[in-house]
Amino acid sequence: MTQAFFFLLLVSLVASTLSKEFNFCPRAIDEVCPVKEKRNECCSSKECRFGEMCCSEPCGNVCRVKSDTPLGFPAKEDSNCKVGEIKKKWYQKVWSKITKWG
């Protein structure tokens, strides 16, 4: 009798764990990008491994393990997104020089 009870308890625990939806990005590792150049590891969650999703972080898009709480931001699927180094536009370079002086 006790073996059947523990078996049912184990099955229900596993079922409840597997049914939980993990569809959120975890909190970003850095609040501000510590490196000069940004780099995209992914542009869509389809480019990430199973159990991961493409998340937007200060240094670019990265594949992160899914979370059950919405602490981070998913990457916007954009046709202009390219994997690799993100080149700054001319006005972004000007703005970074202005803010460096101020």
From Swiss-Prot:
Chain positions listed as propeptide in the UniProt record: 20-39
Highest taxon above the source species: Eukaryota
PTM per Swiss-Prot/TrEMBL: Contains 5 disulfide bonds.
Annotated GO CC locations: extracellular region
Modified residues (Tryptophan amide): W101
Membrane spanning stretches: none
Similarity annotation: Belongs to the venom protein 11 family. 02 (wap-2) subfamily.
The protein's name: U7-agatoxin-Ao1a
Taxonomic source organism: Agelena orientalis (Funnel-web spider)
